[in-house]
From Swiss-Prot:
It comes from Arabidopsis thaliana. This is Amine oxidase [copper-containing] zeta, peroxisomal. Pathway: Amine and polyamine degradation; putrescine degradation. Transmembrane segments: none annotated. One of its GO terms (biological process) is lateral root formation. The gene is CuAOzeta.
Length: 776
């Protein structure tokens, strides 16, 4: 794949008629010095000897300052405020909290659920991007008559820790200021300070993999469980798989005063085959309730004897086991070659690709986060599109009312964590081409630091034709290949795999995509039994119907600087004109817009019959036709929950009742079901409660919450491992540009030697002569 070269736009109006911004000479330039308390009380110091007005900022990697422009300011910051926490920072945060424990018993009971960076106020992010980190963008800050207030340093980075005390069954949230954290190779100078701590009553934090492993061990050692397995012909406990599931909230018995799990049981056929598909033999009829705080089985009942399904000969998916061990022999290598390397540039977590730029983040709960998305648009400069993009929750409700399937209602982000379950990706398998990987650092349950190497993949993909036109009169044609930049990660939650992707396109589109694969969650059947709530996969084995819902949170900033809040949301429906004088041919239809003025009216559902979509517009920026600039949310395939409104899981997942929610930005509103959905007894917490404030959305800082899902009626072709299912949505420019931003994409060199490059047709052998055929 050839690398793209830079060209000016072919559209004379692209970029608009506004003149490029000029930096105004600051009269009394000042420096804001941040105190330890991180307030913005500034001591003012003359900057005449340090800074002077400039037209551009040099790269901080340059050894010598440019002749024209700003002298390189002394900067001690090595990490951007939006960068994920490093391993050293996590260690400091954990050590600081542990040292702050009231007594040894409290410190010994601390278990660390999550340690993540505290994302600062948007104004702090703007300061960092303007003056501390290349490509230095002072235009991000609003101009004032007195000139910019330029800090000598940024406030300290902060960590937020969710801590579960296993001895007291309490959950607490801590904020730690990471005043100085340097690598050990630089002297090991580590320092943190507790800013705040708070015990959160009546909640349970997400479960941890260490808890799941311990739960499996204690269940397999529980004598009544061993006897129940013997009743089913299983005496080797090494064959048994115990998958702990959070109990959700169905009644007061599930209250968060206890930390509970109800495991699902499976059984392999061969303990010497670690890659055997153990999910092919579910064990039903055994009820187990585990106290995860004290790690004891508190309820057990062998309720119903259901024979184990016989081993399915098609259950395995490894090369030596699938289809008799015979793989396809006609698959030839397909290589992605970029002889000049990729077209993207990476500086830390900052990514530039053609006209796009953004920052990559990662959290234990959400996984991949995309920050500060902007498009560099000619003379109009850097134009923001979104402040923050991420997948904040997913819910998987099952449709079988029988035990144990009715309680399968997983909140995979809020109960487990998408980021904590991420994969270490492999080149050539998970991603192809010239790849940049990013590692992710987490705390484990006891406070140690673990690293998932190659957790996030950044690479370019060819995506077919971008645009083409051939003049039928002259036969002359112009065609451009489409290329997209993809940022992705994959995670495993029990039996399912999910891939989360953000695609950036040359025509200004952003596509969010989820790829679903993995293994079905199955149930066992009695001999001769069938169920209407699922699909029979093999003798004695069936897959219940279920749904997957994903919630994307999009903090939009269309043409808005960090301090601005000039966005609004309109809904567009295509209407059919009534019969009459204006529609004598009965062919008329038109697009009708409706402004979503407040949160109460901004709870919306998809409507494919009216081609419904939503546009986020800037109320103070126009394109060359005088229309407001905007980006529109275009739904893909979608659905709503098929459970009745009284379903118990909807108490915690009220946000599933609509496909779109729009709220006014509030920094503490991050998760649609509240921060702690595990065993949450409070109905409608999160989005459904926030929108009751009915805040105005007219010219504000808006956040889109898009809920999209898929209804999975399993089929035999989903067994033993599911081919990838695709689902997602698109953010598309709508009047944001003055013409197509893709017209300046250079043409690819067409292959001229077609005779050598084209695939040769297979020539069939000549038919044998009749006489020879009769002899054979």
């Amino acid at each position: 794949m050839a690398s793209a070269s830079k060209k000016t736009s072919a559209c004379p109006h692209h970029g608009g008629s506004l003149p490029p911004p000029k930096l105004v000479s600051a009269a009394p330039d000042t420096v804001a010095v941040w105190s330890d308390a991180d307030d913005q009380r500034a001591s003012k110091v003359s900057l005449e000897s340090v800074i002077r007005p400039v037209d551009s900022f040099p790269d901080n990697t340059a050894k010598k300052p440019a002749n024209k422009g700003i002298s390189v300011m002394p900067r001690t910051e090595t990490k951007h405020p939006l960068d994920p926490l490093s391993a050293a920072e996590i260690s400091v945060a954990v050590a600081t909290v542990r040292a702050a424990g009231a007594n040894p018993e409290v410190r010994d009971g601390m278990r660390f659920i999550e340690v993540a960076s505290v994302e600062p106020d948007k104004q702090v992010v703007a300061l960092a991007d303007a003056y501390f980190f290349p490509p230095f963008q002072p235009s991000l800050l609003p101009r004032t008559k007195s000139g910019p207030v330029i800090p000598m340093k940024l406030p300290p980075r902060r960590a937020r820790l969710v801590v579960y005390n296993q001895k007291s069954n309490e959950t607490s949230v801590w904020i730690v200021a990471l005043s100085e954290v340097h690598a050990v190779t630089r002297g090991g100078h580590h320092r943190g300070r507790v800013v705040s701590s708070q015990v959160i009553p009546d909640v349970q934090p997400p479960m941890d993999a260490a808890e799941y492993a311990e739960c499996e061990a204690i269940v397999k050692d529980f004598p009544p469980f061993i006897e129940a397995m013997k009743r089913r012909g299983i005496e080797d406990m090494d064959l048994v798989m115990v998958d702990p599931w959070c109990v959700g909230y169905h009644s007061e018995a599930d209250a968060p005063s206890r930390r509970l799990a109800k495991p699902l049981i499976y059984c392999r056929t061969d303990s010497d085959s670690p890659m055997e598909n153990g999910y092919a033999r579910p064990v039903e009829g055994i009820y187990v309730l585990v106290d995860m705080q004290n790690m004891v089985v508190i309820e057990f009942e062998d309720r119903k004897f259901v024979p184990l399904p016989p081993p399915d000969p098609l259950r395995n998916y490894t090369p030596g086991e699938s289809r008799g061990g015979v793989d396809r022999s006609d698959v030839k290598p397909l290589q992605i070659i970029q002889p000049e390397g990729p077209s993207f540039r990476v500086r830390g977590y900052f990514v530039e690709w053609q006209k796009w730029n953004f920052r990559i983040g990662f959290t234990p709960r959400e996984g991949l986060v995309i920050h500060s998305v902007a498009y560099v648009d000619g003379s109009r400069g850097r134009r923001p599109v979104a402040h923050r993009l991420s997948f904040v929750e997913m819910v998987v409700p099952y449709g079988d009312p029988n035990e144990p399937h009715y309680r399968k209602n997983a909140f995979d982000a809020g109960e487990d964590g998408l980021g904590k379950n991420a994969h270490s990706l492999k080149k050539g398998c998970d991603c192809l081409g010239s790849i940049k990987y990013f590692d992710a650092h987490f705390t484990n349950f006891t406070g140690g630091v673990e690293t998932i190497e190659n957790c996030v993949c950044l690479h370019e993909e060819d995506h077919g034709i971008l645009w083409k036109h051939q003049d039928w009169r002259t036969g002359l044609a112009e065609v451009r290949r489409s290329r997209r930049l993809t940022v992705s990660f994959l995670c495993t939650v029990a039996n399912y795999e999910y891939g989360f992707y953000w695609h950036f396109y040359q025509d200004g589109k952003i596509e969010a995509e989820v790829k679903l694969t993995g293994i079905l969650s199955l149930g066992a059947l009695q001999p001769g039994e069938t169920r209407k709530y699922g699909t029979t996969i093999a003798p004695g084995l069936y897959a219940p119907v279920h749904q997957h819902f994903f919630i994307a949170r999009m903090d939009m900033s269309v043409d808005c600087k960090p301090a601005e809040a000039f966005n609004q949301v309109v809904e567009v429906n295509v209407r059919v004109d009534e019969r009459g004088e204006n529609n004598v041919h009965n062919n008329a239809f038109y697009a009708e817009e409706k402004l979503l003025k407040s949160e109460a009216v901004a709870m919306r559902d998809c409507d494919p019959l009216s081609a419904r979509h939503w546009i986020v517009r800037n109320t103070r920026t126009v394109n060359r036709t005088g229309q407001l600039t905007g980006y529109k949310l275009v739904p893909g395939s979608n659905c709503l929950p098929l459970a009745r409104p009284e379903a118990k899981f909807l108490r915690r997942a009220a946000f599933l009742k609509h496909n779109l929610w729009v709220t006014r930005y509030a920094p503490d509103e991050k998760f649609p079901g509240g921060e702690f959905p595990n065993q949450n007894p409070r109905a409608g917490e999160g989005l459904a409660t926030w929108v009751k404030q009915n805040r105005s959305l007219e010219e504000s800082d808006v956040v889109l919450w898009y809920v999209f899902g898929i209804t999975h009626v399993p089929r035999l072709e989903d067994w033993p491992v599911m081919p990838v299912e695709h689902i997602g949505f698109t953010l598309m420019p709508h009047g944001f540009f003055n013409c197509s931003p893709a017209v300046d994409v250079p043409p690819n060199p067409c292959e001229l030697e077609t005779k050598e490059s084209e695939v040769k047709e297979v020539v069939a052998p000549k038919a044998l002569q009749t006489g020879l055929l009769s002899k054979l």
